[in-house]
Amino acid sequence: MSLIPVVVEQTNRGERSYDIYSRLLKDRIVFLGHPINDELSNLIIAQLLFLEAEDPDKDIHLYINSPGGSVTAALAMYDTIQYIKPDVATICMGQAASAGALLLASGTKGKRYALPNARVMIHQPAGGVQGKATEAEIHIKELLRLRERLNEILSKHTGKSVEQISKDVEQDYFMTAEEALEYGIIDEVITKNELKDK
């Protein structure tokens, strides 16, 4: 069961209550705090598109604490981040693993952050196949194609070669915030309130 806090705000018309995510959205903050699936991806995409429509010139802050999840759902969010006009600052708190790491790296260059105790993990996509051999072969080819595409995206955002990324993602590759900075997934390790000044 998921409990969502409610925030009460005083306005000139009286009190107004918001669920915490709606209140954060008012400040152009989107929070990705679950495993990534199609439903979550659609919610995040809708928030990004709403914020772009509201003010296409003002930054959006995407906070990430996710173990990863569906590659196709993550790619839908990735494409949206690249598509919209506002800069998207990405901030890892806790973890950005697998597809979460891809989204962390996809933020606007110079605006990708992690808190000091955050961890980042990259690896190749995983999948399972059942059924006829011909169907299994189709799914394996698609998985290999997705792996290559993910490696190309990480290469684009980190500055590492596709060959280096391919080697690194053969197994789970864990990084501290400082190591993610050295790798090129983030641009800065931040601490208390530093982001508000940027």
From Swiss-Prot:
Its EC number is 3.4.21.92. The keyword Cytoplasm applies. GO terms for cellular component: cytoplasm; endopeptidase Clp complex. Coiled coil: none annotated. PANTHER family: ATP-DEPENDENT CLP PROTEASE PROTEOLYTIC SUBUNIT. Cleaves peptides in various proteins in a process that requires ATP hydrolysis. Has a chymotrypsin-like activity. Plays a major role in the degradation of misfolded proteins. This is ATP-dependent Clp protease proteolytic subunit. The gene is clpP.
